[in-house]
Amino acid sequence: MERLRQIASQATAASAAPARPAHPLDPLSTAEIKAATNTVKSYFAGKKISFNTVTLREPARKAYIQWKEQGGPLPPRLAYYVILEAGKPGVKEGLVDLASLSVIETRALETVQPILTVEDLCSTEEVIRNDPAVIEQCVLSGIPANEMHKVYCDPWTIGYDERWGTGKRLQQALVYYRSDEDDSQYSHPLDFCPIVDTEEKKVIFIDIPNRRRKVSKHKHANFYPKHMIEKVGAMRPEAPPINVTQPEGVSFKMTGNVMEWSNFKFHIGFNYREGIVLSDVSYNDHGNVRPIFHRISLSEMIVPYGSPEFPHQRKHALDIGEYGAGYMTNPLSLGCDCKGVIHYLDAHFSDRAGDPITVKNAVCIHEEDDGLLFKHSDFRDNFATSLVTRATKLVVSQIFTAANYEYCLYWVFMQDGAIRLDIRLTGILNTYILGDDEEAGPWGTRVYPNVNAHNHQHLFSLRIDPRIDGDGNSAAACDAKSSPYPLGSPENMYGNAFYSEKTTFKTVKDSLTNYESATGRSWDIFNPNKVNPYSGKPPSYKLVSTQCPPLLAKEGSLVAKRAPWASHSVNVVPYKDNRLYPSGDHVPQWSGDGVRGMREWIGDGSENIDNTDILFFHTFGITHFPAPEDFPLMPAEPITLMLRPRHFFTENPGLDIQPSYAMTTSEAKRAVHKETKDKTSRLAFEGSCCGK
């Protein structure tokens, strides 16, 4: 059999290799995906396999930098695959060399389960609708057996359930009822939960609560315009349009996936798991191209729910590791999801059969006005002396849907050298049925008759691979502190002294820190080998992030064990190429036991992280206590954080941006007439805008 595999692999290699993209970090093309899957099929000839993942195995950091900065060889083009083999436990994973079209690495992992794909989820609804035991439970809930086409489910990863462990590839089906296909099912949840074997496509068990609850008889809580007209009589009058125009075109330049904008240059990648990946981020500082970050992405997230009742403890989706921000990404619509002058990037994946599939317009790139960049006026001449510069920001965005929730991710580049991540949470609350005489509290809120929306958290892990002014970086916590010297002392005579206390992390254990609102804690990532000529301090990028709620699940709980990164706002570990995912490579149905992911990387906490290549992981998010205003469709809830330069430049890097208006004191004295660059703004109710 091994000889047959070798022959098949050699036959595949004899065919032409797919064209190689211009940049080694570019995602796999459809031709590369097909070539990779054909190679894997040939290698496993005679076996019944299906594909779960086919994606780029990014070049090693060192190899990439040698190619980019030192004239080294082009890194090999590799595809990473995960497959399932019928009748075999776990997965097989490996690498395909796309130049030789050969499998160069493969291994079997029998005690893990792979990420859930859209194909996996789409089959679940039909499985439960046709299962006799589910039909019986629907009838007991008050739904006629001939209305199973009105029963819907959100297929969730099961998280972990000790009854089955990792032996079967499972989903839990959260079940709902629609009286009409346009209804929102979330106002009519059912009280039982089928467990579905994804590969066998059958229900293997149904979790049934001790107390039974009939399906709600209340009208569905719907939200489309036709429903709102029925509710309130009419929609609001349509507001006059606010048009975004750029008659002279955009100011960014795209070369393949490489972006150049306002002195920034970086590569935009996209994969099945993290979605958008920003790599090789640099800044052209008046001719000196300075590296900032080697790679930035969202590496994991968890949404733990707060009801202690069985089986709600299983509701703690690690959406990035269990579904994939890439797999679940939306095709974006011009003028709706993104507004203005837009450039899109598509995303390419493999289906179970090994054929390429494309999500059109997966990534949106555009510019927006961002208000004032800076302004100063002089009161001495009645504010005639004035400098006003407006800001433009570059936004790289995607939106992905994880069952009921939408996650809108916006990577924002700013003209003062800062990089911001804005996340907007919207979509629909996950709901569970309330009996007529039941109270929701304290673990949830009654947001509609018979509807309980449970308390929950959204916690994200931001992975930062820094290269602040080159290799050899460090990290520190920065806290605002009052002077230790007492009022009236020579060092603090008037009692008003305060300062920034910077604590550099020497070891991994030092870095395990949490946000402190009392001290306005921020974190610096810096290069200790360089010095700002003015401040005498090392060039750094400061992480400013104040939305850092603690993980509320108890230490030792299933939630805490499966998210070993979420117990601290910051975890800094030594760099290794394979340290990508802080809950491990294969997250579904992991019990949280054992040493893997962040738990493995932290170890005993003694490793050095000062003046070396480091990985900086940041946990942030929100705690959500639902309210009726969040239902039936939730207004977008914002989360934001910023990476801003500190001691990186010698002055405000945005001063060379063309101002909107500039009048010096000497010009004001000579009564020089100047007009603003903006010729489109006008007064709302009369005339045109003034000259200033």
From Swiss-Prot:
GO molecular function, one term: quinone binding
Cofactor binding remark: Binds 1 copper ion per subunit. Can also use zinc ion as cofactor. Contains 1 topaquinone per subunit.
InterPro entries in UniProt: Cu_Am_Ox_Cu-bd, Cu_Am_ox_TPQ-bd, Cu_amine_oxidase, Cu_amine_oxidase_C, Cu_amine_oxidase_C_sf, Cu_amine_oxidase_N-reg, Cu_amine_oxidase_N2, Cu_amine_oxidase_N3
Record flagged with keyword Transmembrane helix: no
Low complexity composition bias: residue spans: 1-22
Cofactor: Cu cation; Zn(2+); L-topaquinone; Mn(2+)
Annotated positions binding Cu cation: H456, H458, H624
PANTHER family, per the entry: COPPER AMINE OXIDASE (PTHR10638), COPPER AMINE OXIDASE 1-RELATED (PTHR10638:SF86)
Name this protein carries in UniProt: Peroxisomal primary amine oxidase
Name of the encoding gene: AMO
